[in-house]
A protein has these predicted regions:
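N-terminal capping segment at the start of a domain
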Residues: 14-44, 312, 371-373
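A non-catalytic alpha/beta surface segment that caps or lines the substrate-entry region
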Residues: 39-86
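Active-site metal-coordination/substrate-binding segment of hydrolases
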Residues: 47, 72-73, 80, 86-155, ...
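Acidic, glycine-rich active-site loops and adjacent beta-strand->loop/helix elements
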Residues: 67-69, 97-99, 154-162, 184-186, ...
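Acidic-glycine-rich active-site phosphate/pyrophosphate-binding loop
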Residues: 98-113, 191-203, 330-331, 362
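Glycine/charged-rich beta-loop-alpha catalytic/anionic-binding loops adjacent to active sites
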Residues: 110-122, 205-209, 336, 368-372
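Acidic/histidine-rich catalytic neighborhood of metal-dependent amide-processing enzymes
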Residues: 119-195, 237, 243, 254-255, ...
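Metal-dependent amide/peptide-bond hydrolase catalytic core
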Residues: 221-404
Protein backbone atom coordinates (compact mmCIF):
# COMPACT_ATOMS: atom_id res chain seq x y z
CA UNK A 1 0.00 0.00 0.00
CA UNK A 2 1.16 3.51 -0.78
CA UNK A 3 2.43 5.41 2.24
CA UNK A 4 2.13 9.19 2.06
CA UNK A 5 4.01 11.51 4.38
CA UNK A 6 1.96 14.66 4.96
CA UNK A 7 3.94 17.59 3.57
CA UNK A 8 5.52 20.47 5.44
CA UNK A 9 3.27 23.24 6.73
CA UNK A 10 2.89 26.39 4.65
CA UNK A 11 4.46 29.42 6.29
CA UNK A 12 1.24 31.38 5.90
CA UNK A 13 -0.58 28.72 7.91
CA UNK A 14 1.81 28.63 10.85
CA UNK A 15 -0.84 29.84 13.28
CA UNK A 16 -3.43 27.58 11.73
CA UNK A 17 -6.39 29.75 12.73
CA UNK A 18 -7.43 30.38 9.12
CA UNK A 19 -7.63 26.67 8.36
CA UNK A 20 -11.20 25.46 8.70
CA UNK A 21 -12.87 22.15 8.25
CA UNK A 22 -15.12 21.74 5.23
CA UNK A 23 -18.55 21.65 6.87
CA UNK A 24 -20.43 20.51 3.78
CA UNK A 25 -18.01 17.66 3.17
CA UNK A 26 -18.17 16.58 6.81
CA UNK A 27 -21.98 16.66 6.81
CA UNK A 28 -22.20 14.64 3.59
CA UNK A 29 -19.74 12.04 4.82
CA UNK A 30 -21.62 11.64 8.08
CA UNK A 31 -24.92 11.11 6.26
CA UNK A 32 -23.25 8.59 3.94
CA UNK A 33 -21.83 6.64 6.87
CA UNK A 34 -25.14 6.70 8.74
CA UNK A 35 -26.80 5.00 5.76
CA UNK A 36 -24.38 2.06 5.98
CA UNK A 37 -25.77 -0.61 8.32
CA UNK A 38 -23.18 -1.52 10.96
CA UNK A 39 -24.68 -3.31 13.93
CA UNK A 40 -22.21 -4.87 16.35
CA UNK A 41 -20.40 -7.85 14.78
CA UNK A 42 -21.64 -6.71 11.34
CA UNK A 43 -19.35 -3.77 10.60
CA UNK A 44 -17.74 -5.14 7.40
CA UNK A 45 -19.41 -2.72 4.97
CA UNK A 46 -18.48 0.42 6.86
CA UNK A 47 -14.99 -0.92 7.55
CA UNK A 48 -14.41 -1.35 3.81
CA UNK A 49 -15.68 2.17 3.14
CA UNK A 50 -13.33 3.58 5.77
CA UNK A 51 -10.43 1.47 4.55
CA UNK A 52 -10.75 3.12 1.14
CA UNK A 53 -10.97 6.54 2.79
CA UNK A 54 -7.84 5.98 4.87
CA UNK A 55 -5.85 4.60 1.94
CA UNK A 56 -6.87 7.57 -0.23
CA UNK A 57 -5.49 9.82 2.50
CA UNK A 58 -2.19 7.96 2.38
CA UNK A 59 -2.31 5.78 5.46
CA UNK A 60 -0.90 2.33 5.96
CA UNK A 61 -4.03 0.36 6.83
CA UNK A 62 -4.67 -3.05 8.30
CA UNK A 63 -7.53 -4.91 9.94
CA UNK A 64 -6.78 -6.99 13.01
CA UNK A 65 -8.23 -10.33 14.11
CA UNK A 66 -10.71 -8.92 16.64
CA UNK A 67 -13.61 -9.96 14.42
CA UNK A 68 -12.56 -13.60 14.55
CA UNK A 69 -12.22 -13.44 18.32
CA UNK A 70 -15.70 -11.99 18.92
CA UNK A 71 -17.61 -13.78 16.17
CA UNK A 72 -17.92 -10.75 13.90
CA UNK A 73 -17.43 -10.29 10.16
CA UNK A 74 -14.53 -7.83 10.38
CA UNK A 75 -11.92 -6.65 12.87
CA UNK A 76 -10.74 -3.29 14.14
CA UNK A 77 -9.44 -0.99 11.40
CA UNK A 78 -6.07 0.59 12.17
CA UNK A 79 -4.56 3.33 10.00
CA UNK A 80 -1.06 4.75 10.50
CA UNK A 81 -0.35 8.23 9.15
CA UNK A 82 3.21 9.53 8.98
CA UNK A 83 3.51 13.15 10.04
CA UNK A 84 5.96 15.89 9.15
CA UNK A 85 7.02 16.84 12.69
CA UNK A 86 9.20 13.93 13.86
CA UNK A 87 9.70 15.38 17.34
CA UNK A 88 5.96 15.66 17.96
CA UNK A 89 4.12 13.11 20.04
CA UNK A 90 2.26 10.48 18.01
CA UNK A 91 -1.48 10.90 18.61
CA UNK A 92 -4.30 8.37 18.72
CA UNK A 93 -7.69 9.28 17.23
CA UNK A 94 -10.40 6.68 17.73
CA UNK A 95 -14.13 6.10 17.28
CA UNK A 96 -16.27 2.98 17.01
CA UNK A 97 -17.96 1.76 13.84
CA UNK A 98 -20.87 -0.20 15.33
CA UNK A 99 -24.32 1.03 16.30
CA UNK A 100 -27.04 -0.29 18.59
CA UNK A 101 -30.42 -1.67 17.54
CA UNK A 102 -32.72 -0.68 15.94
CA UNK A 103 -30.04 0.44 13.52
CA UNK A 104 -30.76 -0.98 10.07
CA UNK A 105 -32.03 0.93 7.03
CA UNK A 106 -31.59 4.24 8.84
CA UNK A 107 -33.23 7.23 7.15
CA UNK A 108 -31.36 10.42 8.20
CA UNK A 109 -33.47 13.57 7.97
CA UNK A 110 -31.97 17.06 7.96
CA UNK A 111 -33.92 19.96 9.48
CA UNK A 112 -31.71 23.03 9.40
CA UNK A 113 -28.68 22.13 11.51
CA UNK A 114 -30.43 19.21 13.23
CA UNK A 115 -29.97 15.67 11.94
CA UNK A 116 -32.45 13.04 13.13
CA UNK A 117 -34.28 9.93 11.86
CA UNK A 118 -37.83 9.03 10.91
CA UNK A 119 -38.36 7.71 14.45
CA UNK A 120 -38.08 4.04 13.49
CA UNK A 121 -34.36 3.61 14.20
CA UNK A 122 -31.49 5.19 16.05
CA UNK A 123 -29.53 7.80 14.10
CA UNK A 124 -26.13 6.18 14.49
CA UNK A 125 -24.42 9.44 15.39
CA UNK A 126 -23.08 7.26 18.18
CA UNK A 127 -20.46 6.93 16.94
CA UNK A 128 -20.41 7.72 13.24
CA UNK A 129 -20.12 11.38 14.16
CA UNK A 130 -16.74 10.58 15.71
CA UNK A 131 -15.72 8.52 12.68
CA UNK A 132 -16.66 11.33 10.28
CA UNK A 133 -14.80 13.95 12.33
CA UNK A 134 -11.59 11.92 12.22
CA UNK A 135 -11.83 11.49 8.45
CA UNK A 136 -12.45 15.21 7.89
CA UNK A 137 -9.63 16.31 10.20
CA UNK A 138 -7.13 14.07 8.42
CA UNK A 139 -8.24 15.34 5.03
CA UNK A 140 -7.80 18.98 6.12
CA UNK A 141 -4.37 18.21 7.58
CA UNK A 142 -3.28 16.57 4.35
CA UNK A 143 -4.79 19.14 1.96
CA UNK A 144 -3.26 22.07 3.87
CA UNK A 145 0.02 20.38 4.76
CA UNK A 146 -0.42 21.31 8.41
CA UNK A 147 2.30 20.39 10.91
CA UNK A 148 1.51 17.15 12.67
CA UNK A 149 3.14 14.23 14.33
CA UNK A 150 2.41 10.63 13.47
CA UNK A 151 -1.26 9.76 13.86
CA UNK A 152 -2.71 6.34 14.65
CA UNK A 153 -6.38 6.00 13.78
CA UNK A 154 -8.35 3.14 15.34
CA UNK A 155 -11.91 2.46 14.24
CA UNK A 156 -13.13 -0.24 16.61
CA UNK A 157 -15.82 -2.87 16.30
CA UNK A 158 -18.31 -3.97 18.95
CA UNK A 159 -18.01 -1.03 21.33
CA UNK A 160 -21.73 -1.35 21.94
CA UNK A 161 -21.30 -5.05 22.74
CA UNK A 162 -19.13 -4.50 25.80
CA UNK A 163 -16.10 -2.67 24.35
CA UNK A 164 -14.88 -6.03 23.07
CA UNK A 165 -13.27 -4.64 19.92
CA UNK A 166 -11.01 -2.37 21.96
CA UNK A 167 -10.34 -5.20 24.39
CA UNK A 168 -9.01 -7.33 21.52
CA UNK A 169 -6.78 -4.56 20.14
CA UNK A 170 -3.02 -5.09 20.37
CA UNK A 171 -2.03 -1.65 21.67
CA UNK A 172 1.62 -2.61 21.32
CA UNK A 173 1.29 -2.15 17.56
CA UNK A 174 0.40 1.52 17.98
CA UNK A 175 2.99 4.28 18.02
CA UNK A 176 0.74 6.64 19.95
CA UNK A 177 0.62 6.51 23.74
CA UNK A 178 -1.90 9.33 24.11
CA UNK A 179 -4.88 10.70 22.24
CA UNK A 180 -8.63 11.09 21.95
CA UNK A 181 -11.69 8.92 21.65
CA UNK A 182 -14.57 10.84 20.03
CA UNK A 183 -17.62 9.27 21.63
CA UNK A 184 -19.57 11.53 23.94
CA UNK A 185 -22.83 13.45 23.87
CA UNK A 186 -22.08 16.40 26.16
CA UNK A 187 -20.66 19.35 24.25
CA UNK A 188 -18.22 21.56 26.14
CA UNK A 189 -16.72 18.74 28.17
CA UNK A 190 -13.62 16.62 27.88
CA UNK A 191 -14.26 13.43 29.79
CA UNK A 192 -11.20 12.36 31.73
CA UNK A 193 -12.75 10.14 34.39
CA UNK A 194 -15.11 7.20 33.96
CA UNK A 195 -16.14 4.37 36.27
CA UNK A 196 -15.04 0.77 36.40
CA UNK A 197 -17.82 -1.75 35.84
CA UNK A 198 -18.61 -5.30 36.87
CA UNK A 199 -20.91 -7.46 34.78
CA UNK A 200 -22.97 -10.06 36.64
CA UNK A 201 -25.08 -13.04 35.69
CA UNK A 202 -27.09 -14.76 38.41
CA UNK A 203 -28.88 -18.05 37.78
CA UNK A 204 -31.52 -18.70 40.44
CA UNK A 205 -32.57 -22.34 40.82
CA UNK A 206 -35.94 -23.36 42.25
CA UNK A 207 -38.07 -26.49 41.89
CA UNK A 208 -40.62 -27.05 39.15
CA UNK A 209 -44.15 -28.29 39.79
CA UNK A 210 -47.60 -28.09 38.21
CA UNK A 211 -48.88 -24.59 38.91
CA UNK A 212 -52.52 -25.68 39.19
CA UNK A 213 -52.41 -29.19 40.64
CA UNK A 214 -49.61 -28.97 43.22
CA UNK A 215 -47.93 -25.55 43.34
CA UNK A 216 -46.97 -26.20 46.97
CA UNK A 217 -44.51 -28.83 45.71
CA UNK A 218 -42.54 -26.23 43.79
CA UNK A 219 -40.20 -23.36 44.52
CA UNK A 220 -40.65 -20.49 42.10
CA UNK A 221 -37.27 -19.27 40.92
CA UNK A 222 -38.95 -16.07 39.76
CA UNK A 223 -40.37 -15.46 43.23
CA UNK A 224 -36.96 -16.08 44.79
CA UNK A 225 -35.38 -13.64 42.34
CA UNK A 226 -38.08 -11.05 43.01
CA UNK A 227 -37.53 -11.44 46.75
CA UNK A 228 -33.82 -10.78 46.31
CA UNK A 229 -34.29 -7.87 43.92
CA UNK A 230 -36.72 -6.23 46.34
CA UNK A 231 -33.91 -6.03 48.90
CA UNK A 232 -31.35 -4.54 46.52
CA UNK A 233 -30.17 -0.98 46.29
CA UNK A 234 -30.34 -0.19 42.58
CA UNK A 235 -30.13 2.85 40.32
CA UNK A 236 -28.14 5.81 41.66
CA UNK A 237 -26.39 4.55 44.79
CA UNK A 238 -24.28 7.68 45.36
CA UNK A 239 -22.43 10.28 43.29
CA UNK A 240 -19.84 7.67 42.26
CA UNK A 241 -21.84 4.46 42.01
CA UNK A 242 -24.75 3.02 40.01
CA UNK A 243 -26.29 -0.43 39.66
CA UNK A 244 -28.85 -2.00 37.37
CA UNK A 245 -30.57 -5.28 36.58
CA UNK A 246 -31.18 -5.09 32.86
CA UNK A 247 -32.30 -8.57 31.80
CA UNK A 248 -34.53 -11.20 33.41
CA UNK A 249 -35.08 -14.49 31.59
CA UNK A 250 -36.97 -17.49 32.92
CA UNK A 251 -39.97 -19.74 32.92
CA UNK A 252 -41.33 -22.15 30.33
CA UNK A 253 -45.13 -21.93 30.60
CA UNK A 254 -47.78 -20.24 32.73
CA UNK A 255 -48.84 -23.59 34.21
CA UNK A 256 -45.37 -24.57 35.43
CA UNK A 257 -43.76 -23.27 38.62
CA UNK A 258 -40.45 -22.02 37.15
CA UNK A 259 -37.33 -23.84 38.27
CA UNK A 260 -34.83 -21.38 36.83
CA UNK A 261 -34.43 -17.69 36.12
CA UNK A 262 -31.42 -15.73 34.86
CA UNK A 263 -30.66 -12.17 35.93
CA UNK A 264 -28.11 -10.05 34.05
CA UNK A 265 -26.86 -7.02 35.91
CA UNK A 266 -24.09 -4.49 36.25
CA UNK A 267 -22.55 -2.20 38.84
CA UNK A 268 -20.35 0.82 38.14
CA UNK A 269 -18.29 3.07 40.36
CA UNK A 270 -15.40 5.50 40.31
CA UNK A 271 -14.32 3.86 43.58
CA UNK A 272 -13.00 0.30 43.54
CA UNK A 273 -14.08 -0.22 47.14
CA UNK A 274 -17.63 0.91 46.41
CA UNK A 275 -17.77 -1.24 43.29
CA UNK A 276 -16.79 -4.32 45.28
CA UNK A 277 -19.32 -3.48 48.01
CA UNK A 278 -22.19 -2.98 45.57
CA UNK A 279 -21.38 -6.16 43.67
CA UNK A 280 -21.30 -8.25 46.83
CA UNK A 281 -24.48 -6.57 48.08
CA UNK A 282 -26.38 -7.67 44.98
CA UNK A 283 -25.05 -11.20 45.22
CA UNK A 284 -25.81 -11.40 48.94
CA UNK A 285 -29.42 -10.22 48.47
CA UNK A 286 -30.10 -13.09 46.09
CA UNK A 287 -28.30 -15.69 48.20
CA UNK A 288 -30.18 -14.63 51.32
CA UNK A 289 -33.46 -14.74 49.42
CA UNK A 290 -32.67 -18.26 48.23
CA UNK A 291 -31.96 -19.34 51.81
CA UNK A 292 -35.46 -18.21 52.81
CA UNK A 293 -37.09 -20.52 50.27
CA UNK A 294 -37.01 -24.10 51.51
CA UNK A 295 -39.41 -26.97 50.82
CA UNK A 296 -39.81 -30.29 52.62
CA UNK A 297 -41.55 -33.00 50.64
CA UNK A 298 -41.43 -36.80 50.50
CA UNK A 299 -38.88 -36.85 53.29
CA UNK A 300 -36.50 -34.59 51.40
CA UNK A 301 -35.42 -30.98 51.80
CA UNK A 302 -35.28 -28.79 48.71
CA UNK A 303 -33.65 -25.37 48.81
CA UNK A 304 -33.39 -22.62 46.24
CA UNK A 305 -29.84 -21.74 45.27
CA UNK A 306 -27.95 -19.13 43.29
CA UNK A 307 -25.07 -19.47 40.84
CA UNK A 308 -23.16 -16.25 40.31
CA UNK A 309 -20.85 -15.30 37.46
CA UNK A 310 -19.11 -11.97 38.06
CA UNK A 311 -16.47 -10.47 35.81
CA UNK A 312 -14.79 -7.12 35.32
CA UNK A 313 -16.26 -5.42 32.29
CA UNK A 314 -13.72 -2.60 32.22
CA UNK A 315 -11.47 -0.61 34.55
CA UNK A 316 -11.98 3.02 35.40
CA UNK A 317 -10.51 5.89 33.43
CA UNK A 318 -8.66 8.53 35.42
CA UNK A 319 -6.67 10.95 33.28
CA UNK A 320 -5.00 13.84 35.10
CA UNK A 321 -5.86 17.42 34.20
CA UNK A 322 -2.10 17.86 33.77
CA UNK A 323 -1.85 15.09 31.18
CA UNK A 324 -0.42 16.24 27.81
CA UNK A 325 -3.60 15.37 25.89
CA UNK A 326 -5.75 17.37 28.31
CA UNK A 327 -3.41 20.35 28.08
CA UNK A 328 -3.44 20.12 24.29
CA UNK A 329 -7.23 20.08 24.03
CA UNK A 330 -7.56 22.96 26.48
CA UNK A 331 -5.02 25.00 24.53
CA UNK A 332 -6.88 24.23 21.31
CA UNK A 333 -10.16 25.33 22.87
CA UNK A 334 -8.58 28.55 24.10
CA UNK A 335 -7.24 29.31 20.62
CA UNK A 336 -10.75 28.83 19.23
CA UNK A 337 -12.42 30.83 22.03
CA UNK A 338 -14.28 27.73 23.17
CA UNK A 339 -14.90 26.98 26.82
CA UNK A 340 -14.22 23.37 27.69
CA UNK A 341 -14.11 21.68 31.08
CA UNK A 342 -12.80 18.34 32.22
CA UNK A 343 -15.56 16.15 33.57
CA UNK A 344 -16.32 12.73 35.02
CA UNK A 345 -18.92 10.54 33.31
CA UNK A 346 -20.97 7.57 34.44
CA UNK A 347 -20.57 5.77 31.12
CA UNK A 348 -17.85 3.51 29.85
CA UNK A 349 -16.28 3.66 26.40
CA UNK A 350 -13.25 2.48 24.47
CA UNK A 351 -11.16 5.08 26.32
CA UNK A 352 -11.53 3.00 29.49
CA UNK A 353 -9.95 0.05 27.71
CA UNK A 354 -7.19 2.08 26.07
CA UNK A 355 -6.20 3.53 29.44
CA UNK A 356 -6.27 0.03 30.91
CA UNK A 357 -3.81 -0.97 28.17
CA UNK A 358 -1.38 1.74 29.26
CA UNK A 359 -2.39 4.61 26.97
CA UNK A 360 -3.50 8.04 28.18
CA UNK A 361 -6.75 8.78 26.36
CA UNK A 362 -9.61 11.21 27.02
CA UNK A 363 -13.10 11.28 25.49
CA UNK A 364 -14.32 14.32 23.52
CA UNK A 365 -17.93 15.06 22.58
CA UNK A 366 -19.24 15.17 19.01
CA UNK A 367 -22.74 16.67 19.22
CA UNK A 368 -24.83 13.50 19.48
CA UNK A 369 -27.95 13.58 21.69
CA UNK A 370 -30.51 11.11 23.08
CA UNK A 371 -28.33 8.21 22.02
CA UNK A 372 -29.53 4.60 22.11
CA UNK A 373 -33.09 5.74 21.37
CA UNK A 374 -35.17 6.26 18.23
CA UNK A 375 -35.27 9.93 19.24
CA UNK A 376 -31.52 10.31 18.73
CA UNK A 377 -30.46 13.54 17.06
CA UNK A 378 -27.32 15.49 16.31
CA UNK A 379 -26.60 19.21 16.18
CA UNK A 380 -24.36 19.85 13.20
CA UNK A 381 -23.06 23.09 14.73
CA UNK A 382 -21.66 21.08 17.62
CA UNK A 383 -20.27 18.50 15.20
CA UNK A 384 -18.39 21.21 13.29
CA UNK A 385 -17.11 22.75 16.52
CA UNK A 386 -15.81 19.40 17.75
CA UNK A 387 -14.09 18.74 14.43
CA UNK A 388 -12.44 22.17 14.53
CA UNK A 389 -11.19 21.47 18.05
CA UNK A 390 -9.71 18.11 17.05
CA UNK A 391 -8.03 19.76 14.06
CA UNK A 392 -6.52 22.45 16.28
CA UNK A 393 -5.37 19.82 18.78
CA UNK A 394 -3.57 17.92 16.02
CA UNK A 395 -2.03 21.14 14.68
CA UNK A 396 -0.84 22.32 18.09
CA UNK A 397 0.71 18.95 18.78
CA UNK A 398 2.72 19.21 15.57
CA UNK A 399 3.57 22.90 15.84
CA UNK A 400 4.71 22.75 19.46
CA UNK A 401 6.38 19.38 20.10
CA UNK A 402 7.23 18.46 23.70
CA UNK A 403 10.48 19.72 25.16
CA UNK A 404 12.97 16.89 25.59
Amino acid sequence: MRKLVIGAARQTDTLGFNILINQERLKNLLIELIKIDSLSRREYDIAMRLKREMEELGATVWIDDAGEKVGGNVGNLIANFSGNAPSARPLLLSAHMDTVVPGERIVPLLDGDILRTDGKTVLGGDDKSGVAIICEVLRVVKDNRLPCGDIDVVFTICEEAGLVGAKCLDAGRLRARTGLVLDSDSVGFLFTKAPAANRMEFRVHGLEAHAGVCPEKGISAIKVAADGIAQMKLGRIDHETTANIGVIEGGMAVNIVPNSVILKAEARSHSQEKLDQQTQHMRRCLEEAAARHELRADGKVFRARVEAKIERDYDRMNVSDQAPIVQLVQAAAENLNIEIKTQATGGGCDANVFNQKGLEVANLSTGMRDIHTVNEWLDLKDLYLSAQMVLETVRLNGAHPPVA
